[in-house]
Structures are given as C-alpha cells and as structure tokens.
C-alpha cells in the first residue's frame, strides 16, 4: 500500500553502502552465488502468529529441510532451529536469545550444515505521523555454502505489524559481522535491516 511505498523510500537511509572486499570474502561470495544460481536452497515465506514466526530452509539438492522459529520482542529475538525429517522435528539449536547489533553467534551444526551464524539487526524510522517504526531482521549465514537468508519483521508504535518475504543472499562473515554480497563480485556490505 501507500504506507509501504513511503517506507521503501525511507529505508534507503537504513541501507549500508557497498565496499570492496578481500579475496577470502570474494571467494565465499562467488561460492554462494553459484549455490544460489543452482537453486540449491529455498526459503519458505514467514508464517507468523502474533510475534512468533517460523520459516523453513529447504536444501533442494539433498533434499533436507531445516525450520527456524523466531519469537520477536522489541530489542531481542529468540531463535530455535529444528531439522524436519519424516515429519519429525529434531531440535538442533536453541531456543536462545540474540540481541540486535551484537556480533554474530556461530555454532557448528554437524557435517551437512556446517557452521551457522546468526545476527540480529534493527533499523528505526519515524512514520509520517511520527510513530516509531522498527524493522527487526535476523541474518542466518551458512558459512560452508557461502550464502544466507535475511528474515525481517516490522513493529509500528511498539506493536507487531507484519513480516517481509525472506531474502536469500550470497554472504560471509568478516570482522564480527555478516556481510551481504553486492552485484559486483568484489563488493559487499554489512548486513542491514532493509528487507529487500
């Protein structure tokens, strides 16, 4: 709607700018781009009930399915990760809470997934009528595959107002933050709270 268009313009202010990356990150980005090109991973839309949301990552080549549950609150996100197999869910990680803006928390999750890094990011805007508008995003990075997903929800005036389509990106982790690849192969940016 019209409100969303206004925010899309405003989000420009929350976007981090792209900068040149070193050889290690560039190699990870290229690996991630190849994996995404092969459609090696898909991410389900967020399914939210109140401020609890769930989304699944599907590895299409294997096939394997991992689901992530998020409970969002104003400044923190509680996350748990389950592996879905034969209609049975096995908890791999969590539930644990991450604060926005902290360095990524990385955990080794067995030989298939490898290392998973999670980072919370938040972006704050005032809406045209002065109400606080907050985007909360979780960056999930699969280091072994060089790619990740960004899952974002928004709060308006302290109330949960909805979720965005998850975004897949080629990425890596460097200097204590998750990096998102740009269009040029040697460019990346620190993950931001802009949903697309």
Curated annotation (Swiss-Prot):
One of its GO terms (cellular component) is extracellular region. Keywords: Secreted, Toxin. The keyword Acyltransferase does not apply. Expressed by the venom gland. Probable insecticidal toxin that has been detected in a semi-pure insecticidal fraction. Belongs to the redulysin-like family. This is Venom platylysin. It comes from Platymeris biguttatus (Two-spotted assassin bug).
